[in-house]
Regions:
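Short alpha-helical segment that forms part of, or immediately flanks, the ligand-binding pocket
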Residues: 225, 248-253, 267
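Conserved active-site histidine-acidic residue motif and adjacent donor-binding/catalytic loop
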Residues: 66-72, 203-204, 212-228
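Short hydrophobic beta-strand element within catalytic cores of glycosyltransferases
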Residues: 257-264
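A charged, aromatic-enriched C-terminal amphipathic alpha-helix characteristic of glycosyltransferases
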Residues: 14, 284, 297-327
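Acidic donor-binding loop of glycosyltransferase active sites
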Residues: 84-85, 226-243, 256
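Donor nucleotide-sugar binding/catalytic pocket of nucleotide-sugar-dependent glycosyltransferases
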Residues: 120-150
Length: 327
């Protein structure tokens, strides 16, 4: 079977990381052929990586967020016909944007919403998003695995961080460390707990202090592994929560616990909390966060198994799910 894997762009964020894994293990585990399809109308920072591993086809058409993409659909139908594609997989927001080719099986994999069913299979990226929309549609998890499993180095010496320091880190979208009530207790705890450091990768600055260290974004998986290795835990503070969080997963697979808001506001997605359950530290407000950070020590963070992803989200488990749901 020949499967086309489509994304709206070949960017450097989690969507394309997941796309690459599905395409990779579609070949290695399911024994199918994978082809990558995307657009040349947007930046393609990961194009070389995809071209190294798969036949990669770029089309010039521009996707329109209007619910109608007839020109793009025609282009994709020609590619499907010329390449002998059996199934067209698209990782997407979840809206029916009417671009998927109609001359093969259409597989829609939804990241953010599941209220506009379309295609031959309409599935979410996790149980949480399926349940959020009534549980009527299936789901296929993202593959979570430890990148660069042999990498055990960290950045403490390079950054001048003492071995006995407690380092809380985070990475993700630059503007998604945005739960505003956390800033004051975080700074207050930093001033009281002299062993506390914050290490932020690709994160907008909110306070200047010698023990708050900012690093630029990197696509290098080994550098990201060294960054996570430097940390004792992840400090999570995203205003709208998580449907499925790859950033928290990257910490958990290296056995680093997550500190996150136990929010119940209507806007707050609790997908990450449903995954972690009791394998995380939670705060309900600024006071709880301050007490947690002021009193945090290595004994509370080490010696436990924080990896909640090792079985259900493995390549074999997920690709078997992929086969059952999509194929």
């Amino acid at each position: 079977m020949k499967i086309a894997f489509h994304s709206y762009q070949l960017g450097d964020r989690g969507t394309e990381i997941c796309l690459h894994k599905y395409a990779k293990y579609n070949q290695q585990i399911l024994g199918n052929e994978s082809v990558i399809i995307s657009t040349s109308s947007r930046p393609t920072p990961t194009l070389e990586r995809f071209e190294k591993d798969f036949k990669t086809i770029l089309y010039p058409d521009v996707w329109q967020n209007t619910g109608s993409n007839p020109e793009l659909k025609n282009t994709l139908e020609k590619i499907v016909s010329e390449e002998g594609i059996d199934a067209f997989y698209a990782i997407k927001g979840g809206e029916d944007d009417d671009f998927m080719p109609e001359n093969c099986k259409r597989l829609a994999h939804c990241i953010f919403r599941m209220d506009e069913p379309h295609g031959d299979v309409y599935a979410g990226v996790c149980k949480y998003i399926s349940d959020k929309h009534g549980g009527t549609h299936p789901y296929v998890y993202h593959i979570i695995e430890k990148e660069c499993p042999d990498e055990d180095a960290n950045l403490r010496s390079e950054l001048g961080i003492p071995d006995d320091a407690i380092v809380l880190g985070r990475h993700g979208g630059a503007d998604t460390f945005n739960l505003s009530f956390v800033y004051h207790p975080l700074i207050k705890a930093l001033l009281e707990n002299k062993k506390l450091y914050f290490l932020f990768l690709n994160t907008n600055k909110f306070y200047d202090h010698g023990r708050i260290i900012h690093l630029p974004w990197t696509m290098d998986p080994r550098k990201k592994a060294q960054f996570v290795n430097t940390c004792d835990a992840m400090m999570h503070a995203r205003f709208d929560g998580e449907i499925f969080s790859l950033a928290t997963a990257e910490f958990a697979v290296r056995n680093k616990p997550i500190i996150t808001w136990d929010g119940h506001d209507p806007h707050y997605d609790r997908g990450h909390i449903e995954v972690f359950k009791d394998k995380a530290f939670y705060y309900k407000d600024g006071n709880e966060l301050f007490e947690l950070l002021r009193n945090i020590d290595h004994s509370k963070l080490s010696g436990n198994n924080w990896n909640v992803y090792k079985d259900t989200y493995s390549p074999t488990a997920v690709m078997n799910q992929f086969k059952d749901v999509f194929l």
